[in-house]
Structures are given as structure tokens and as C-alpha cells.
Amino acid sequence: MELLDKVLEYYKVKNPLVVKHLLIKYMNLVLEKNKLFNLTAIENEEEFVIKHIADSLSLLKFIEQENSNQNPVAIDIGSGFGAPGLFVKIAMPSVNVFLNDSNKKKCKFMNEAKESLGISGVNVVCERAEVLGRKEEFREKFDFVFARAVDRLNVLCEYAIPLLKVGGAFLAQKGFECEDEIDLAKNAIEILGGEIYSIEKFVLPYSDEKRSIIIIKKLRQTPSNFPRNTKQIVKKPL
């Protein structure tokens, strides 16, 4: 696929032939399974390349910029069929990725996909993110947390920040107009031990799709009473 070649060149992905082969295989797995149950609203390959692959790979330069660990550990919350986490793993194999979703069908698919692709350093965790944030084996264990526009930022922060190590970064992928969400999330970010580090706005390559990535750094440990349960997080956001 010429468009995919261009996207991989744009993001300066290493070993592009190997990465391209795996990405196409993964895309085909998603589109085939999508006929049986809903994984994505996107059915066109070129649209998939832009809205899923290019969108996910937009994280790469920020991972490189913020990473002080040779083999960083990242968790993708609300991963769905594995976006952006599995795309990041394919393009940047040094990252150890946990794919988190509470939907059992989607988790089953992600496990099948990683086995089919023959990729190591990928773990699928089928659980609610706020439950993981209270478990010792997950709390404050990650260099990066990814989330793709799955909820409001003030809600996402209570799921994401407890999972980060001090010094780690939450990379929240949002639409272009995100200022109101950021304003509403400032209190939550402060309470949970974080700080807005930067807001990156850009257009996805070979498209007119506008995006933002909000980078939130963790400066101190999250208080032990967070995260709260889902009902409290959603109904009474910080």
C-alpha cells in the first residue's frame, strides 16, 4: 500500500518493510473480525491507515522525547482492538505494552491478534482501568499511559495518572479543539499528582484530520484514595 509506505516514511519508522507487513496483517485481522462484531466504524483500508495507523503512530516522537528508559513499559487504557498500543508496539518494538480493556470480546481479539502476529512484549489485561490503578502490580508501574479520546480528560486522568510512575507521562489523544476539556481537568491533574507538560496540535499526514496530544507528566505519587470507583469518577469528576 503506497499510502502506508508514505506514512511510515513520514514517521521515520525503522525497518519499514517488516513493520509494513505486520501492520497490514493486523489491519486485515481487524477488518475481518469487524464483520462479526463491532471493533471499528472504519471499513475502508485507506481510511484505516490514516485514522488508526497514522493516528496511533503520532505518539512515537513523544515517546522518544519523553523516554529515559531503554525498554519503557506502557499501558493503553480503553484499547478496544489494540489502538494505539499494538500499533506503537509494532513500530517501536522496544516498548513493552499492556493493552487494557474491560470488554471480554475485545480482549479475546487482542490476544488472538498478538499471537497471530507473533509479537512478544505484549500483555492483554481484561479489567476496568480504575481497578488496575488500585492493584499493587499495576499502580505506579508504567512509564507511559495512552488513551485515545475514550472519555473526558478529567475522567481519563483519574484512570491514567495512578498507573504512572513518578516521572512518567500520560499521552492523551484528543481532537483539535481540546482547551475546554483541559481547563476542566486542571484540578484533577493537580490532585492526582500531575502537571500539564505540553499540548501538541497537528494534522495527520496525507489527510486533513486534525488532532491534539496532551502530555501530562507525573510529578509526585497519587494519593492512596484515588482512583475512586467508576460511578464516582463519572458522576463527580475531580
Curated annotation (Swiss-Prot):
InterPro entries listed in its UniProt record: rRNA_ssu_MeTfrase_G, SAM-dependent_MTases_sf
Its EC number(s): 2.1.1.-
Top EC class for this record: transferase
Alphabetized UniProt keyword annotations: Cytoplasm, Methyltransferase, rRNA processing, S-adenosyl-L-methionine, Transferase
Organism: Caldicellulosiruptor bescii (strain ATCC BAA-1888 / DSM 6725 / KCTC 15123 / Z-1320)
Presence of the UniProt keyword Metal-binding in the record: no
This protein's GO CC annotations: cytosol
Binding-site list for S-adenosyl-L-methionine: 78, 129-130, 148
Gene3D superfamilies: Vaccinia Virus protein VP39 (3.40.50.150)
PANTHER family, alphabetized: S-ADENOSYL-L-METHIONINE-DEPENDENT METHYLTRANSFERASES SUPERFAMILY PROTEIN
Assigned protein family: Belongs to the methyltransferase superfamily. RNA methyltransferase RsmG family.
Protein name, per record: Ribosomal RNA small subunit methyltransferase G
Superkingdom assignment: Bacteria
SUPFAM superfamilies named in the record: S-adenosyl-L-methionine-dependent methyltransferases (SSF53335)
Entry annotated with the keyword Amino-acid biosynthesis: no
Primary location group: cytoplasm
Single GO term (MF): rRNA (guanine-N7-)-methyltransferase activity
Taxon lineage: Bacteria, Bacillati, Bacillota, Bacillota incertae sedis, Caldicellulosiruptorales
Cell compartment(s), UniProt: Cytoplasm
Record function comment: Specifically methylates the N7 position of a guanine in 16S rRNA.
